[in-house]
A protein has these predicted regions:
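NAD(P)-binding Rossmann-fold cofactor-contacting core
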Residues: 1-5, 116, 121, 130-147
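N-terminal beta-loop-helix "entrance" segment that forms/cooperates
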Residues: 1-15
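Short acidic low-complexity segments
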Residues: 13-24, 140-153
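Short glycine-/small-residue-rich Rossmann-like dinucleotide-binding loops
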Residues: 32-33, 52-53, 161-165
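Glycine/serine-rich phosphate-binding loop and adjoining beta1-alpha1 elements at the start
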Residues: 34-111
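Rossmann-like adenosine-cofactor binding region
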Residues: 142-184
């Protein structure tokens, strides 16, 4: 992981094992449970914890229930009203922006950016965008109409919204795409 040898993890107290051995343990920590392809290999009574996003991912929820697993969803863990992984969410926003600009081959300065969302991920995205000189406007659910009106002026749109699965529409439609600036 991250080009760090297993020995380095062992020096810090970790037990490194095969996937097969890990899946026999009572508790499995997987930060990206939503991407898990091994749930069918788990046994009734085992526990998994990480970013489950069960509400947004019915297939994962179904597998957890069918296999009699317990799940602890990090996205549902709060202490005194604050998400316990708030800084992780902020870092996710920062990293996503950096990665997107790297893929695009442009630098954020001289770009106009719309950030949709008001949570920690949006906060991280906005922080790094400001640090790199972008012009940023933030929108929320209550300003969706304004966002759609102003959409054509943006070079970049960063979506940091945890989607309401009951909604059947889209924030940006195919028609909206026709009015956006062309990418490179």
């Amino acid at each position: 992981i991250l080009q760090i040898e297993d020995d380095e993890f062992v020096k810090c107290g970790a037990h490194v094992c095969s996937r097969e051995e890990a899946l026999t343990k009572d508790i499995i920590c997987d930060p990206k449970v939503g991407d898990a392809e091994y749930l069918e290999q788990m046994n009734e009574g085992q526990t998994i914890f990480g970013w489950v996003h069960a509400t947004q991912n019915y297939d994962i929820t179904e597998k957890i229930v069918q296999h009699g697993l317990s799940a602890y969803a990090w996205e549902s863990m709060y202490e005194k009203g604050r998400h316990i992984f708030w800084r992780n969410n902020e870092l996710a926003g920062e990293a996503a922006v950096l990665h997107a600009y790297q893929c695009w081959g442009e630098m954020p300065y001289r770009t106009k950016v719309a950030v949709i969302g008001r949570g920690n991920t949006a906060g991280g995205a906005i922080k790094i965008l400001h640090m790199l000189g972008a012009s940023v406007r933030q929108y929320s659910r209550s300003t969706e109409e304004l966002f759609k009106e102003e959409l054509p002026m943006f070079d970049v749109v960063v979506n940091c919204v945890l989607w309401d699965v009951k909604r059947k529409d889209h924030i940006i439609t195919k028609e909206d795409l026709k009015h956006m600036k062309k990418g490179h």
